[in-house]
């Protein structure tokens, strides 16, 4: 897409980055539900093992019990008859209502006697039943899924940090900056918004600011930012090939470098990164805010979060009751777009959901 940008117009529009950025490669396809076939001297067992790890070509006319050996059937039935609904949700295809239906079916009709009984459970059809049995027998697939999750974290969150360390954090500060403002959102793992602010720092013009100016301005901002285990910065991904955006790109790089240096106070001592960057478009994809290569405003989504915090027992984000009205007025009644403020909150929520999943509090 050809795109022409006038720097003066960008500044007049309020300083936020309304220009296309290259979309990162799409997520990898879901791994096929396959696993290796162990050699066996018993032909009937080898055939059953193949059936257990390959769902292709199965027809409803082929009863479930014929696809698995007696030993495999016993293993599957043991899980189906003893696991709680929460334990059953560990299997991807049984998340939500299906796991509850299995437990309710057990209570109403007694333990499952045959694998074929699984099809009698509401919402579970033949193909789903076969894949559920496969996933119970092939834990390797779950290990591959965990490996895929680690790959996603390495791809979108940099520099690389051990997953165990990411999952040990108690609070983060998400920071987003533009050509006029710096905004931050301080969230714990619930996630509850502990602090959410923005400050005017500069007006980017055609003149060049000395490095000392950046140091003074950003040091002043950092003095207001709360302490946290990790600081998450937005990585815009602007292309250097668009020469008209070079002044803005340079501004972003200087600001980012200053934040990395000033917030990583103990890096020289322990070598541990406490400042990470997350790709802007990855957050946009996480919340379905992308239209082509361009990320749209997150204002409506933030307003939805504010409403759900009052209306829902388990909202996606919790807001302190004493600050809820203040935040809502700031978002709803603002006469100009404060995109940095919206994006700092969305970035924090996306980080927690990428690391912990949507029910992060339950995994603490």
Curated annotation (Swiss-Prot):
Annotated GO CC locations: mitochondrial matrix; mitochondrial nucleoid; ribonucleoprotein complex
InterPro entries: RNaseH_sf (IPR036397), RuvA_2-like (IPR010994), TEFM (IPR039150)
Keyword NADP: no
Pfam families associated with the record: HHH_3
Transit peptide limits: 1-39
Keywords, ordered alphabetically: Mitochondrion, Mitochondrion nucleoid, Transcription, Transcription regulation, Transit peptide
Region forming the signal peptide: none
Gene3D superfamilies in UniProt: Ribonuclease H-like superfamily/Ribonuclease H
Molecular function per GO: nucleic acid binding; transcription elongation factor activity
Cellular compartment(s): Mitochondrion matrix; Mitochondrion matrix, Mitochondrion nucleoid
GO biological process, one term: regulation of oxidative phosphorylation
Location (main, coarse): mitochondrion
Keyword Transcription regulation attached: yes
Subunit details: Interacts with POLRMT.
UniProt similarity note: Belongs to the TEFM family.
Reported function: Transcription elongation factor which increases mitochondrial RNA polymerase processivity. Regulates transcription of the mitochondrial genome, including genes important for the oxidative phosphorylation machinery.
Protein's name according to its UniProt entry: Transcription elongation factor, mitochondrial
Organism: Mus musculus (Mouse)
């Amino acid at each position: 897409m050809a795109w022409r940008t006038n720097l003066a117009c960008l500044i007049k529009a309020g300083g936020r980055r309304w220009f296309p950025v290259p979309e990162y490669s799409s997520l990898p396809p879901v791994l096929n539900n396959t696993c290796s076939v162990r050699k066996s001297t018993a032909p009937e067992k080898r055939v059953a093992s193949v059936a257990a790890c390959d769902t292709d070509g199965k027809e409803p006319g082929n009863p479930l019990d014929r696809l698995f050996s007696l030993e495999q059937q016993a293993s599957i039935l043991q899980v189906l008859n003893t696991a709680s609904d929460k334990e059953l949700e560990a299997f991807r295809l049984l998340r939500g209502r299906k796991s509850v239906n299995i437990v309710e079916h057990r209570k109403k009709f007694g333990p499952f006697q045959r694998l074929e009984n699984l099809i009698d459970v509401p919402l579970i059809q033949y193909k789903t039943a076969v894949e559920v049995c496969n996933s119970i027998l092939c834990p390797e697939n779950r290990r591959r899924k965990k490996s895929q999750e680690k790959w996603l974290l390495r791809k979108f969150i940099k520099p690389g940090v051990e997953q165990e360390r990411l999952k040990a954090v108690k609070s983060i500060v998400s920071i987003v900056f533009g050509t006029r403002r710096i905004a931050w959102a301080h969230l714990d793992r619930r996630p509850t918004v502990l602090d959410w602010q923005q400050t005017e720092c500069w007006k980017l013009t055609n003149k060049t600011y000395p490095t000392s100016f950046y140091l003074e301005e950003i040091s002043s901002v950092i003095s207001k930012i709360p302490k946290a285990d990790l600081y998450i910065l937005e990585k815009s991904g602007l292309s250097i090939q668009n020469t008209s955006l070079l002044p803005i790109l340079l501004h972003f790089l200087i600001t980012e470098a200053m934040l990395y240096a000033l917030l990583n106070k103990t890096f020289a001592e322990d070598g541990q990164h406490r400042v990470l960057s997350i790709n802007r478009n990855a957050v946009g994809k996480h919340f379905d805010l992308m239209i082509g290569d361009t990320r749209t405003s997150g204002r409506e989504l933030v307003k939805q979060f504010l409403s759900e915090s009052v209306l829902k027992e388990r909202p996606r984000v919790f807001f302190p009751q004493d600050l809820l009205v203040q935040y809502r007025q700031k978002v709803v009644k603002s006469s100009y777009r404060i995109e940095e403020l919206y994006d700092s909150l969305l970035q924090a929520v996306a980080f927690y959901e990428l690391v912990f999943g949507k029910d992060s509090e339950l995994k603490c």
